[in-house]
Amino acid sequence: MSKLTKIGYDLDDVSIVQTPISPIRHRNECNPYRTIAGREMYPVIVSPMATVTDEHNYKTWLDNKFMCVVPRSVDIQTRLNLMNEVFVSFSLDEADSVFFSKTIIEDMANNPGKKIYICIDLAHGTMSALYDVCRNIKNVFGPSIEIMTGNVATSEAYSFYADAGIDYMRCFIGSGSRCTTASNGSTFYPRASLLDEINDARIKWENDHDKPAPTKIIADGGIKNFDDIQKCLALGADFVMCGNMFAKSEEACGQIVYINPEEFDDYLKGKVKGASEEYYHSQIKDLTNKLKESNTPERTKMFQNLLDEWYRMQPYREYFGMSCRKAQRLMGGLGNKTSEGISRPVPVEYPIAKWADNMKSYLISTMSYAGCYDLDEFKNNTEVIINFSGDKAYRK
């Protein structure tokens, strides 16, 4: 019997269809927010990546209406201190020990109404051990602890997540720009088809149990542009998780290096060096002062040329996957496991407030084209078509 009986479509293969009659007169009538962790936020979550979020900048994301997940590179005591305010990451072993400790059990018992938000952060989200740990946490703490976990690349996992009471399921494997799981390990499912099938699985679970499904769907990985966010939401995702988009913002926490864009490839090959942020600004200041003080045309020209060379350099941020060896060391490991991630700088392009405003504007515009007032309508009612020309027909 042939194994190749299914065809899968990725996000580039689909597009959203305009409704024939839209009741929406102006896009500002559309509501682009969802509630998560007790907050009204955009349906976009910041990935738990060491070069994007830490204990110093997580509030910046929250202030701009993006839920975030504090990564495992932050020390465990800090994560424990933050988990009633924001989602924080734990390994499976950490979750299995921490949340069945006497300290946590007594603290939750003595503080009724207290909420904790955790992300059990691992790549392989269909392990039976993961289901067992999540089910046990829910049996002890119920809705007091909200659990996010994953990742999954099969719609058949949805019923297991819902039965275990898991609140958020991260979907996609190997699609992130710094993840090499699919390219080296070959486990992958085209994302548009996966979301569509998982949404069908959610509807089936609700029909079988005659109640709303407890597990929200998070599309996680490889989001390149605003239209990818909209497609994921239209195909059934409740939230979309991004790393690259936030790494490119001024507010991300990763180290910045200044590089001449024309020499970027040579920088990656180690042929030229970049300049640290501190050194870059010191050189700009020093050369600017020398230019002001120059007293001959020759010196003026020399300092101006040097200053122009420095101004041609642009800020790039260190950006690596959380399974690469450097990330392994940041999370307390030896960094000697086979890497399933890569490191490659991204350009720093915008303040997050500007990106958020654009994301919101494009999202509510698309919602108005679909005739949907809120994100549930958008998820349930928007028509999506297979586009055999791919995104080449419109992506600029």
Predicted feature residues:
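Alpha/beta catalytic cores of nucleotide-metabolism and tRNA/nucleoside-modifying enzymes
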Residues: 1-24, 186-219, 223-396
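Active-site entrance/lid segments in N-terminal catalytic domains of soluble metabolic enzymes
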Residues: 1-216, 244-249, 287-290, 294
